[in-house]
Amino acid sequence: MPIFVFGQQAVVKKIKIEPYMYTQNYEHFKRLVFESPDSEAEYIDRFNFEWGYYYTLRVKELEIGQLSDGTRYEYSLLKVISKEKVSDTVIFRMFIDPLRYYHKLEEEGISNYTLSQLNDSTYLYMDKVEIEIPHKFLEYFRKKTNNEIGFIGNFKFVNGKRIRLVSIR
């Protein structure tokens, strides 16, 4: 049964969230968003996502009308119904894009890049997930990112904030 919040229709519903996020080409920049097979949720207020877990959530879905970026709903977490760790064999595909914006911005304090090097083989991607690059892929990875070219890779989960590249598509 819908409820109304400040004249806008809100619905309480149960949704699933996949154990990974994906790179979305947003209006003026790229970002990581949730993958939900049964909702349009890309971000959920008050939800603390960890990589490598399937989630079932109870959320409030607030209809806000069509925004310029295509967004129609806002989501806020009411309850985590379940949080299930993936098996060690799960592999997922993700696009890695080294550029945050479609055109480089020359403004001070703006980071044009999505990758920050943490050590010789680990990078922080979009300030959200650490990516381990095994030695056999480092040359390919550096060539692509130095030339500001994205690539698709297959990844495994290491822990709630780290993934490992296992193959290149």
In which residue ranges do the predicted regions lie?
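Structural detector for short beta-strands of small beta-barrel domains
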Residues: 8-28, 89-117
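Short, Lys/Arg- and Gly-enriched loop/turn segments at beta-strand edges
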Residues: 63-76, 159-167
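N-terminal post-signal-peptidase region of extra-cytosolic proteins
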Residues: 37-47
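N-terminal accessory interaction module
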Residues: 111-156
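Flexible glycine-rich surface loops and low-complexity tracts that mediate binding to linear polymers
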Residues: 55-64, 143-161
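Bacterial Sec-dependent N-terminal signal peptides
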Residues: 1-9
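A surface/extracellular/periplasmic glyco- and lipid-processing/surface-interacting theme
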Residues: 70, 79-98
